Amino acid sequence: MSPKTETKASVGFKAGVKDYRLTYYTPEYQTKDTDILAAFRVTPQPGVPAEEAGAAVAAESSTGTWTTVWTDGLTSLDRYKGRCYDIEPVPGEENQFIAYVAYPLDLFEEGSVTNLFTSIVGNVFGFKALRALRLEDLRIPPAYSKTFQGPPHGIQVERDKLNKYGRPLLGCTIKPKLGLSAKNYGRAVYECLRGGLDFTKDDENVNSQPFMRWRDRFVFCAEAINKAQAETGEIKGHYLNATAGTCEEMMKRAVFARELGVPIVMHDYLTGGFTANTSLAHYCRDNGLLLHIHRAMHAVIDRQRNHGMHFRVLAKALRMSGGDHIHAGTVVGKLEGERDVTLGFVDLLRDDFIEKDRSRGIYFTQDWVSMPGVLPVASGGIHVWHMPALTEIFGDDSVLQFGGGTLGHPWGNAPGAVANRVALEACVQARNEGRDLAREGNEVIREACKWSPELAAACEIWKEIKFEFDVIDRL
């Protein structure tokens, strides 16, 4: 290239490392109804101003790179760039800020959680100028959420399919989670369903191992469901885990479940991936299957306060990708979950319209328009003494799932199921009569023990069991 050509080409272009603030920090910006909004908890490296850190997040998660490039002149950055439009300090934390970023809708492929996350929680989380970065919340505008199918069926359709109303649904995870033969596994399913549960469940890591291949498990569980339904007159189900090593194998398992006539299948949506999950959700809607979602691996992503992504974001992503149930913690059991935080994302799963409420960790008003809701599943270290609190916290539109709290009953699996069903019915009746379960819950359970020896035995065996540890992720 001649010196003359170099001079001409260099007009209007200045090479070098960018100061992100000049382009991506725009406090005067008025957000649009079609923007996707994000709230990031930003911990900059020492010496990095808050405005520069927030602008860097906006740049690196949208159109930016570390230097000026020639091809910037071939597009409209003002149209496509992310904008850090507000920054606020985090109370009680030194050198930590909430950076609010607005993204134009055109940056994202329609109906793709995979593409949404690849941008917003992609390479920016490894950016050296940031000591830590956490995505606290997203606002998904109707213009984007309407490009998703969402849950295969939703809460009301599920209740109609099951013909069960006015109470939480009851479930049980079969234990031990690994090692049972398919026939013994099916036996446990039958005993729990016959005893009064609505659902039983494969644990998240039950796929197709040498001790129990998936096809054998599916057949024996279908037999157990049919037998329990015939004996009880109630519609029953077992979450058959279709998660597999390939999408093709996953779909093959879902097809076989449909051919067996079972009502519900299951997927581990984080380890399986959003693309696989969305494909399975579409199949479930087209073929009348409910879809239960397990969140295995979520704590790797969401448990640290300063880095990663809050579960409320993963919950919103699941509602868009598709699932009729998702595990949501218990507040009172063995797994992490503060009450206000948990109730915040439970509302984001179930309700159509959720107002901004920082006291519950909700940074943006969320309008789901007509997208069906998802039933939250309370599971993990719970037993009959927790039933009043669970009924009061989660309400009717939930699934209360007792694994060890059913199968650990001293008299066996069916009596364990009976104990849980009696405890639930007693709590629902007491609530409907106007009693305060938060105050009178233990008394309600003790009264019910008079009429149920199975419940009395369960109350005795688990009266001292508690999981009293401080919650890590507080507001």
From Swiss-Prot:
<comment type="subunit">
    <text>Heterohexadecamer of 8 large chains and 8 small chains; disulfide-linked. The disulfide link is formed within the large subunit homodimers.</text>
</comment>
<keyword id="KW-0503">Monooxygenase</keyword>
<dbReference type="GO" id="GO:0009507">
    <property type="term" value="C:chloroplast"/>
</dbReference>
<feature type="binding site">
    <location>
        <position position="327"/>
    </location>
    <ligand>
        <name>substrate</name>
    </ligand>
</feature>
<dbReference type="InterPro" id="IPR033966">
    <property type="entry name" value="RuBisCO"/>
</dbReference>
<feature type="binding site">
    <location>
        <position position="379"/>
    </location>
    <ligand>
        <name>substrate</name>
    </ligand>
</feature>
<feature type="binding site" description="via carbamate group">
    <location>
        <position position="201"/>
    </location>
    <ligand>
        <name>Mg(2+)</name>
    </ligand>
</feature>
<dbReference type="GO" id="GO:0019253">
    <property type="term" value="P:reductive pentose-phosphate cycle"/>
</dbReference>
<keyword id="KW-0934">Plastid</keyword>
<keyword id="KW-0007">Acetylation</keyword>
<keyword id="KW-0601">Photorespiration</keyword>
<feature type="active site" description="Proton acceptor">
    <location>
        <position position="294"/>
    </location>
</feature>
<keyword id="KW-0602">Photosynthesis</keyword>
<feature type="active site" description="Proton acceptor">
    <location>
        <position position="175"/>
    </location>
</feature>
<dbReference type="InterPro" id="IPR017443">
    <property type="entry name" value="RuBisCO_lsu_fd_N"/>
</dbReference>
<dbReference type="GO" id="GO:0000287">
    <property type="term" value="F:magnesium ion binding"/>
</dbReference>
<dbReference type="InterPro" id="IPR020888">
    <property type="entry name" value="RuBisCO_lsuI"/>
</dbReference>
<keyword id="KW-0113">Calvin cycle</keyword>
<keyword id="KW-0488">Methylation</keyword>
<feature type="site" description="Transition state stabilizer">
    <location>
        <position position="334"/>
    </location>
</feature>
<dbReference type="InterPro" id="IPR036376">
    <property type="entry name" value="RuBisCO_lsu_C_sf"/>
</dbReference>
<feature type="binding site">
    <location>
        <position position="203"/>
    </location>
    <ligand>
        <name>Mg(2+)</name>
    </ligand>
</feature>
<dbReference type="Pfam" id="PF02788">
    <property type="entry name" value="RuBisCO_large_N"/>
</dbReference>
<keyword id="KW-0150">Chloroplast</keyword>
<feature type="binding site" description="in homodimeric partner">
    <location>
        <position position="123"/>
    </location>
    <ligand>
        <name>substrate</name>
    </ligand>
</feature>
<dbReference type="GO" id="GO:0016984">
    <property type="term" value="F:ribulose-bisphosphate carboxylase activity"/>
</dbReference>
<keyword id="KW-1015">Disulfide bond</keyword>
<feature type="binding site">
    <location>
        <position position="295"/>
    </location>
    <ligand>
        <name>substrate</name>
    </ligand>
</feature>
<keyword id="KW-0560">Oxidoreductase</keyword>
<feature type="modified residue" description="N6-carboxylysine">
    <location>
        <position position="201"/>
    </location>
</feature>
<comment type="function">
    <text>RuBisCO catalyzes two reactions: the carboxylation of D-ribulose 1,5-bisphosphate, the primary event in carbon dioxide fixation, as well as the oxidative fragmentation of the pentose substrate in the photorespiration process. Both reactions occur simultaneously and in competition at the same active site.</text>
</comment>
<dbReference type="InterPro" id="IPR000685">
    <property type="entry name" value="RuBisCO_lsu_C"/>
</dbReference>
<protein>
    <recommendedName>
        <fullName>Ribulose bisphosphate carboxylase large chain</fullName>
        <ecNumber>4.1.1.39</ecNumber>
    </recommendedName>
</protein>
<feature type="binding site">
    <location>
        <position position="204"/>
    </location>
    <ligand>
        <name>Mg(2+)</name>
    </ligand>
</feature>
<feature type="binding site">
    <location>
        <position position="173"/>
    </location>
    <ligand>
        <name>substrate</name>
    </ligand>
</feature>
<dbReference type="GO" id="GO:0004497">
    <property type="term" value="F:monooxygenase activity"/>
</dbReference>
<dbReference type="Pfam" id="PF00016">
    <property type="entry name" value="RuBisCO_large"/>
</dbReference>
<keyword id="KW-0456">Lyase</keyword>
<comment type="similarity">
    <text>Belongs to the RuBisCO large chain family. Type I subfamily.</text>
</comment>
<dbReference type="GO" id="GO:0009853">
    <property type="term" value="P:photorespiration"/>
</dbReference>
<feature type="propeptide">
    <location>
        <begin position="1"/>
        <end position="2"/>
    </location>
</feature>
<keyword id="KW-0479">Metal-binding</keyword>
